[in-house]
Curated annotation (Swiss-Prot):
Family stated for the protein in its record: Belongs to the universal ribosomal protein uS8 family.
Purpose of the protein: One of the primary rRNA binding proteins, it binds directly to 16S rRNA central domain where it helps coordinate assembly of the platform of the 30S subunit.
Oligomeric form and interacting partners: Part of the 30S ribosomal subunit. Contacts proteins S5 and S12.
One cellular component (GO) term of this entry: ribonucleoprotein complex
Species, as recorded: Legionella pneumophila (strain Paris)
HAMAP family recorded: Ribosomal_uS8_B (MF_01302_B)
UniProt-recorded name of the protein: Small ribosomal subunit protein uS8
GO biological process, one term: translation
Pfam families (UniProt xref): Ribosomal_S8
Gene3D superfamilies named in the record: 3.30.1370.30, 3.30.1490.10
Stored InterPro entries: Ribosomal_uS8, Ribosomal_uS8_CS, Ribosomal_uS8_sf
Amino acid sequence: MSMHDPIADMLTRIRNGQQAKHQQVTLVSSKLKEEIARVLKEEGYIQDFFTETLPNGLKSITLKLKYYHGRPVIEFIKRISRPGLRVYKSYKDLHSIPGFGVAILSTSKGIMTHVSAKVKGVGGEVICEVA
């Protein structure tokens, strides 16, 4: 069975892993997933992540989930732009996310938060929102 939206799958695994109080989640790796994980780590939503090559040649990425006083640090994580409906924003249209959250964007200068994109004056595809 093919997966139509691997980013939505990644976000769902994070959401489900935190609801089940798992310490980590593992999924098939890609450059985009690694960059999203890097932004989540920089923003303090996950403890760490690492990639490894499996014996069958596939790369996997493991995300170490983060909790604060037993509660998940990520209150919500939502896919915005999806294969059937791409969402693009100019840097002028980037607004704050409720609850001190961030939007993660794919821009011409790489994957970054909406705050970084606004400072650099670039817009792009809004991948997801996290708070």
